[in-house]
């Protein structure tokens, strides 16, 4: 059973918390997450026994949320219903947060209120929201971040400057990670896209990220200056390449290498290697992604 959720309008940012215990104005009744159905794509030959399944696609999800409006008089009830009426609009998407996960849906209708006086009066009113999820998967609220190449800060206080420093040569203010290969774990149920960030600490050219297992890669054929940042988004429906230099953001799609693939994170462990045509030591690489799950419901 789900004991509490938070709803947030994607368009306005307005929030509505529904809980079985702690919310005095709007109380959660129940949440039905529905289920993700699948379609098996198959074909067969003459006289073949059974069929050959070429692939399976996941379909959409339908959800249903019921709750209660609590008030002390008719005026208060009217005002609280108005809040619900403004919040749920079939033209605006809603994010529903549950524990550490979020699911986006579009309301199928405006708010449905109970038609019986026992469940719809000046002190209590039962309501229901039904929604359609084009993307049926739950994703984590917080993006996972992996640093493929970065500078580890070493400077700290108290600062003691010795006349005979160890190691000789002065004080280390930052240490670059020596490995060119990074492991990224996708603990979700499906392959997901990611956001790749190339950041230049000095001049370099041709930054790239390569999947060690498949040898697929993404490369940007451009010389980078110190402080320049390139963001590549490989999420389906959100693919883009943007660059920022001196506070100005531009479209870098024209710099994409023709052989580049929109890299995805497979379920399980993924090994990636970063590189550059010149001065790879000046390159910092970060990868952001969200694990996605079919179902996430816990005990409460």
Which residues fall in each region the model found?
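Intrinsically disordered, low-complexity segments enriched in serine, threonine, and glycine
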Residues: 146-300
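Short, acidic/charged, Gly/Pro-enriched secondary-structure junctions
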Residues: 6, 66-114, 271-273
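Oligomerization/assembly interface segments of phage tail-like spikes and tubes
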Residues: 50-72, 122-136, 270
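Short polybasic amphipathic segments
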Residues: 2-9, 94-96, 206-209, 239-244
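Polar/acidic, low-complexity leader/linker segments enriched in S/T/G and N/D
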Residues: 1-42
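Short beta-strand and beta-hairpin "edge-sheet" elements
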Residues: 95-140
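Short, solvent-exposed beta-alpha or beta-beta edge segments that form flexible loop/patches at the rim
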Residues: 27-64
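Short, charged, solvent-exposed linker or helix-capping segments at domain edges/interfaces
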Residues: 139-147
């Amino acid at each position: 059973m789900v004991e509490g959720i938070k709803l947030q309008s994607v368009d306005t940012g307005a929030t509505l918390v529904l809980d079985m215990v702690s919310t005095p104005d709007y109380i959660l009744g129940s949440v039905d997450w529905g289920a993700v159905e699948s379609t098996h794509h198959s074909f067969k030959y003459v006289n073949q026994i059974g069929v050959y399944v070429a692939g399976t696609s996941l379909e959409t999800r339908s959800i249903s949320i019921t709750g209660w409006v609590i008030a002390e008089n008719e005026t208060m009830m009217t005002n609280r219903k108005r809040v619900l009426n403004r919040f749920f609009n079939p033209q605006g998407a809603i994010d529903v947060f549950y524990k550490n996960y979020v699911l986006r849906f579009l309301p199928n209708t405006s708010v449905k209120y109970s038609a019986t006086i026992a469940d719809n009066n000046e002190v209590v009113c039962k309501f229901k929201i039904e929604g359609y999820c084009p993307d049926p998967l739950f994703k984590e609220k917080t993006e996972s971040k992996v640093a493929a190449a970065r500078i580890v800060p070493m400077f700290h206080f108290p600062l003691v400057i010795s006349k005979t420093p160890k190691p000789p040569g002065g004080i280390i203010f930052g240490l670059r990670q020596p490995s060119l290969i990074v492991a990224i774990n996708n603990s979700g149920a499906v392959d997901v896209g990611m956001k790749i960030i190339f950041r230049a600490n000095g001049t370099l050219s041709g930054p790239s990220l390569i999947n060690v297992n498949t040898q697929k890669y993404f490369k940007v054929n451009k010389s980078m200056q110190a402080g320049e940042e390139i963001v590549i988004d490989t999420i389906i429906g959100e693919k883009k390449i943007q660059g920022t230099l001196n506070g100005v953001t531009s479209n870098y799609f024209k710099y994409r290498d023709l052989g580049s693939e929109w890299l995805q994170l497979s379920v399980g462990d993924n090994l990636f290697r970063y590189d550059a045509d010149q001065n790879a030591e000046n390159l910092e690489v970060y990868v952001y992604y969200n694990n996605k799950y079919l179902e996430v419901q816990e005990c409460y």
